């Protein structure tokens, strides 16, 4: 063969092959689904390119995939007459994994076989799945529009290297031959192969044909029998499609091994005509937070495949949605640039967004357990919604889930509708607190009075929460209120104090003046508070000041953080505050006040500028 060379696999390929063969063996038949799915993609790509260059069909426009086997040679062959590959494409697609973050993904895999198989399934193994059942794979291919002598040969045993060479191939497309491992004879059985193809390929539009050999007049006559329906699933009537078919189609388009949580199939006629089939996965893709992660729907125009990952039809906070849209209103020569500025696209995006939010609302209402699975996988992404989509903010807010003081659990199961239904008589606001962790939120001294009054507080501990709450200002006409900020409604709760207590407070006015004089500009104000029951002091921020959590977000992003000026609030009923107020020695008084302030800052921020000084002060006061 001309131009023959032997190349080494990209190191990640070797590791993936090893893990895949061991992790996916229990579900080994999926290799056929993956290879037929790739053939379907190759046909879609040829149809799309042929829109502008019909000569690419080379007089053969009847696209199909064929499956045949040779029992004597123990080979199984999957061939298509799709777009084919050039030599460079063969090296690029079959010798490397062109995905960012592959190395870190592989490092995340461990020895848990069930978990590994799920992760590898999410990764989309495609062509490499052939090595689950084959100890050698041979590929012969020629790209559409290339001369026969520009065919390409590729072969590998999946060990560490592969051979590539130039060949002559008369027909366009790709032929993959699997040299089956010992013990894999089931894939040489006609009935077994037929059943696998029927299971995985009934929903794709490409005809899948299996070879039939018959003896006639002493000669072997070869014919091809179509064994799938070869009708695009989304074009069929919903009443004719089984749940199993919907699930298999999801696995086909998403390259996911897991069943979806739910789906929505709709045909819309009228001003705009389109069909959509949208799925909510049951597990987040491993690279969902990678900036290079592609997302979006498959786009078809009048049943002709146009592109993968058309992100223009779904907002970023719904990037986990998989599926397709088939539009009758877009031109066949549509490009990503045209989609960006198209009124049709904007209208479709708005309609599909509402469809997904309704689908999630229905899931939450009908199956709380499944919705909790969704929330655990995609809740953080959905929390981007209130800032990105003001038009649907109320609908998104209904889907949010939180931990709260109502449940003694860090699980985020409380909806805003749940919270509102439990609000106390006369309560006008929805109270919440943001913190670095659930434990920090739950034990915050800011909650003491609210707990005493039996008022529920939402406990927010995801990094995105503070940012989200800047945009989510109310729900069901009720404003949100952070309990770590000074607020009139909180003051009202705290001011329910008897007259004798108020008289006692007046006596502490000189003490407050001494504290103000000592701390000066380091705090915004010093005041007494009745918001505390067990804690001597807290710090809080004014309504118009940057919160502690927002300051942390700025710092983590490397941005300049404006100084946060706290209001220092002291509990007049606490023994430590009384002791400080009774201390006449100025040095000792200073130690007490600084210690109380440090305690309050530590509870609020989780850190101190000088923890050693704090420890020294505490030790001195303990021994004095």
Curated annotation (Swiss-Prot):
Localization in the cell: Cytoplasm; Cell inner membrane
Membrane topology: Peripheral membrane protein
Region of interest called C, as start-end residue ranges on this chain: 553-624
Residues covered by region (B): 337-552
Molecular function via GO: ATP binding; ATP hydrolysis activity; ATP-dependent protein folding chaperone; identical protein binding; protein folding chaperone; protein homodimerization activity; protein-folding chaperone binding; unfolded protein binding
Gene3D superfamilies with a match to the protein in the record: 3.30.230.80, 3.40.50.11260, Heat shock protein 90, C-terminal domain (1.20.120.790), Histidine kinase-like ATPase, C-terminal domain (3.30.565.10)
One cellular component term from this protein's GO annotations in UniProt: plasma membrane
Stretches for region Mediates dimerization: 585-624
Record has Chaperone as a keyword: yes
InterPro entries: HATPase_C_sf, Heat_shock_protein_90_CS, HSP90_C, Hsp90_fam, Hsp90_N, Ribosomal_Su5_D2-typ_SF
Record note on modification: Phosphorylated.
Tagged with keyword DNA damage: no
One Pfam family cited in the UniProt record for this chain: HSP90
Region (A): 1-336
UniProt keyword terms in alphabetical order: ATP-binding, Cell inner membrane, Cell membrane, Chaperone, Cytoplasm, Membrane, Nucleotide-binding, Phosphoprotein, Stress response
SMART domains reported for this sequence: HATPase_c
GO biological process, one term: response to heat
Positions contributing to ATP binding: 38, 80, 127, 174, 255
Superkingdom of the organism of origin: Bacteria
NCBIfam families: PRK05218.1
Subunit structure: Homodimer. Oligomerizes at 65 degrees Celsius.
Protein family per UniProt: Belongs to the heat shock protein 90 family.
Function: Molecular chaperone. Has ATPase activity.
Protein name in UniProt: Chaperone protein HtpG
Species, as recorded: Escherichia coli (strain K12)
């Amino acid at each position: 063969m001309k131009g023959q060379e032997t190349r080494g696999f990209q190191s990640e390929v070797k590791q993936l092959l090893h893990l895949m063969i061991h992790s996916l063996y229990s579900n080994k038949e999926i290799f056929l689904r993956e290879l037929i799915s790739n053939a379907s993609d190759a046909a879609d790509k040829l149809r799309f390119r042929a829109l502008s260059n019909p000569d690419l069909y080379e007089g053969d426009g009847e696209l199909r995939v064929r499956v045949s086997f040779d029992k004597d040679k123990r080979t199984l062959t999957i061939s298509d007459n799709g777009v084919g590959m050039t030599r460079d494409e063969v090296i690029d697609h079959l010798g490397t994994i062109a995905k960012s973050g592959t190395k870190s993904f592989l490092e995340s895999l461990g020895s848990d076989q069930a978990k590994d198989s799920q992760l590898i399934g999410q990764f989309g193994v495609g062509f490499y799945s052939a090595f689950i059942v084959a100890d050698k794979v041979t590929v012969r291919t020629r790209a559409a529009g290339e001369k026969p002598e520009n065919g390409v040969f590729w072969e590998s045993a999946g060990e560490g290297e592969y051979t590539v060479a130039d060949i002559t191939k008369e027909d366009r497309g790709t032929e993959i031959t699997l040299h089956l491992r010992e013990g894999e004879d089931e894939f040489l059985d006609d009935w077994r192969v037929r059943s696998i193809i029927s299971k995985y390929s009934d929903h794709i539009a490409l005809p899948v044909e299996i070879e039939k050999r018959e003896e006639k007049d002493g000669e072997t006559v070869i014919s091809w029998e179509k064994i799938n329906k070869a009708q695009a699933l989304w074009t069929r009537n919903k009443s004719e499609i089984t749940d199993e078919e919907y699930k298999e189609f999801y696995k086909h388009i998403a390259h996911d091994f897991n069943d979806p949580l739910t789906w929505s199939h709709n045909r819309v006629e009228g001003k705009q005509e389109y069909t959509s089939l949208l799925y909510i996965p049951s597990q987040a893709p491993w690279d969902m937070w990678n900036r290079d992660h592609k997302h979006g729907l498959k786009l078809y125009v009048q049943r002709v495949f146009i592109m993968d990952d058309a992100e223009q039809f779904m907002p970023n906070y719904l990037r986990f949605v998989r599926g397709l849209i088939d539009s009758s209103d877009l031109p066949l020569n549509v490009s990503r640039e045209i989609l960006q500025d198209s009124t049709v696209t904007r209208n479709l995006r708005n309609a599909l967004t509402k469809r997904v939010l309704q689908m999630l609302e229905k899931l939450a209402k009908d199956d709380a357990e499944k919705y909790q699975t969704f929330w655990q996988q995609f809740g953080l992404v959905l929390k981007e919604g209130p800032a990105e989509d003001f038009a649907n903010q109320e609908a998104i807010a209904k889907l949010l889930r939180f931990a709260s003081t109502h449940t003694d659990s860090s699980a985020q199961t409380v909806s805003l509708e749940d919270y509102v239904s439990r609000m106390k008589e006369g309560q006008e606001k929805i109270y919440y607190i943001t913190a670095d962790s659930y434990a920090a939120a739950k034990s915050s001294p800011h909650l003491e009075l609210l707990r005493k009054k039996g008022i529920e507080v939402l406990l927010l501990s995801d990094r995105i929460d503070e940012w989200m709450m800047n945009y989510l200002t109310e729900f069901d006409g009720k404003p949100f209120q952070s309990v770590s900020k000074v607020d009139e409604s909180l003051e009202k709760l705290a001011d329910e104090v008897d007259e004798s207590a108020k008289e006692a407070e007046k006596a502490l006015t000189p003490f407050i003046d001494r504290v103000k004089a000592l701390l000066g500009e380091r705090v915004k104000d010093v005041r007494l508070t009745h918001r505390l029951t067990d804690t001597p002091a807290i710090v809080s921020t004014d309504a118009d000041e940057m919160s502690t959590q927002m300051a942390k977000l700025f710092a983590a992003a490397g941005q300049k953080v404006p100084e946060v000026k706290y209001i220092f609030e002291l509990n007049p009923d606490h023994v430590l505050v009384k002791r400080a107020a009774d201390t006449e020695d100025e040095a000792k008084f200073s130690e007490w006040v600084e210690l109380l302030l440090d305690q309050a800052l530590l509870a609020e921020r989780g850190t101190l500028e000088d923890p050693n000084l704090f420890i020294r002060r505490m030790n001195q006061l303990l021994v004095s």
